[in-house]
Amino acid sequence: MSTIAQNKGYISQIIGPVIDIEFPNGTLPKIYNAISIKHKNKTITCEVQQLLGDNRVRTVAMNSTEGLQRGIEAIDTGSAITVPVGKCTLGRIFNVLGEPVDELGAISTDRKLPIHRASPLFTQLETKPSIFETGIKVIDLLAPYKRGGKIGLFGGAGVGKTVLIMELINNIAKSHGGVSVFGGVGERTREGNDLYVEMKESKVINEKNLEESKVALVYGQMNEPPGARMRVGLTALTMAEYFRDNNKQDVLLFIDNIFRFVQAGSEVSALLGRMPSAVGYQPTLATEMGALQERITSTKEGSITSIQAVYVPADDLTDPAPATTFAHLDATTVLSRGLASKGIYPAVDPLDSTSTMLQPQIVGDEHYVTAQRVKENLQRYKELQDIIAILGLDELSEEDRLTVARARKIERFLSQPFFVAEVFTGSPGKYVSLKESIDGFKMILNGELDDLPEQAFYLVGNIQEAIKKADELKDK
């Protein structure tokens, strides 16, 4: 306690969320140390960013600095911001400091970890690439996820990002015995609240027994200071790392939105007086992104697979923020408004979504060849659509008509009923193994199911269900 008592300073300057603190000679806190300021029944936590000389440090506040003034006492906590980890975090909502904000009472745990940690050593990494099976046909077949990889999720409003995220959370819990951590970085508070309510409705969060929930939520929304938005991703990542390293689990880490993490870093950089780089971004953009992304990986103990929603400013893919993100991604899942308007869910675009895992030496020849044939078929259908729109189907050659018929069946077979959507659709969710997906698409491509009506393939699980549905349609 004596060192803490010794390490007291006083606020010397406040510029918005940036606070300069003067300490007695020889007691300067370290970079990234948390500084606690108590004022009028509230505690403000700041993080040391720069040592200015003359016994002064420059810090960035994680809470609102409203009401602070020069001369108020500030105490060096002696360590970085620490957050609770473990089972107690499941089903709860936290802020950047690891404080629960869901009004369900305090967290009772002594297990806390600092948010600034080194990435795993090279010797701890799992080097053999393996597929992370999601049970969602379109993803597993055409743009498979890497276990311990990073996936970019692209899509506008209302195309099904949230439902896809919730289905992934549900499936990892059921099939991998894993948990998920959701980091809401700089997005709308209303969206965060909607997600929480939907998770309770779909039983992803178990209200009766919180520790049986499948997800922990960490929010630093749009109205928070830039310091909080910049660090909330690290808070979520620290919770995920504990599940991977100590519980030896497979973890899904969702970051919505990775662009807001960069944006907050840019605001902080400007407030600290750093010279801006290209397009006004921080000069440390690549370093900050690397520090976050390098901690998301597979080790010999478990894995963190990260799915990151990527906002592309003004649809400019060359903007430094998305361009820096792309360098770290192993797969991209692109959601299409066109497919959503056709009622095909999940509305994952089979031609725009990509994955570095789709190589014959990783997924095997059968999977690779089937995926390529599906894409070729859909691409040919896309090329023929203009002709169909102008002249009609009858003007196509016999071969092209067959291609169109199969492509329409494939398009419908890529749809799938979700577990988390059961409450809305009334149809039970389906988990389809990769083997079942490959077998089903091979049968369609080989013409074994040419005599089945295309509506038999819509919103079913495996191919046997489609055949059964076709029989039921015939009976009607």
Swiss-Prot record:
Keyword Nucleotide-binding appears in the UniProt entry: yes
Known EC number: 7.1.2.2
GO molecular function: ATP binding; ATP hydrolysis activity; proton-transporting ATP synthase activity, rotational mechanism
Location (main, coarse): plastid
GO cellular component: chloroplast thylakoid membrane; mitochondrion; proton-transporting ATP synthase complex
Keywords: ATP synthesis, ATP-binding, CF(1), Chloroplast, Hydrogen ion transport, Ion transport, Membrane, Nucleotide-binding, Plastid, Thylakoid, Translocase, Transport
Subcellular location: Plastid, Chloroplast thylakoid membrane
Residues at which ATP binds: G155, G156, A157, G158, V159, G160, K161, T162
Catalytic activity as recorded in UniProt: ATP + H2O + 4 H(+)(in) = ADP + phosphate + 5 H(+)(out)
A Pfam family of this chain: ATP-synt_ab
Membrane topology term: Peripheral membrane protein
InterPro entries (alphabetical): AAA+_ATPase, ATP-synt_VA_C, ATP_synth_F1_bsu, ATPase_a/bsu_AS, ATPase_alpha/beta_chains, ATPase_F1/V1/A1_a/bsu_N, ATPase_F1/V1/A1_a/bsu_N_sf, ATPase_F1/V1/A1_a/bsu_nucl-bd
Highest taxon, organism lineage: Eukaryota
Top-level class of the enzyme under EC nomenclature: translocase
A single GO BP: proton motive force-driven mitochondrial ATP synthesis
Known role: Produces ATP from ADP in the presence of a proton gradient across the membrane. The catalytic sites are hosted primarily by the beta subunits.
Classification via PANTHER family: ATP SYNTHASE, ATP SYNTHASE SUBUNIT BETA, MITOCHONDRIAL
Family assignment from sequence similarity: Belongs to the ATPase alpha/beta chains family.
Quaternary structure note: F-type ATPases have 2 components, CF(1) - the catalytic core - and CF(0) - the membrane proton channel. CF(1) has five subunits: alpha(3), beta(3), gamma(1), delta(1), epsilon(1). CF(0) has four main subunits: a(1), b(1), b'(1) and c(9-12).
Protein name: ATP synthase subunit beta, chloroplastic
Protein's organism: Galdieria sulphuraria (Red alga)
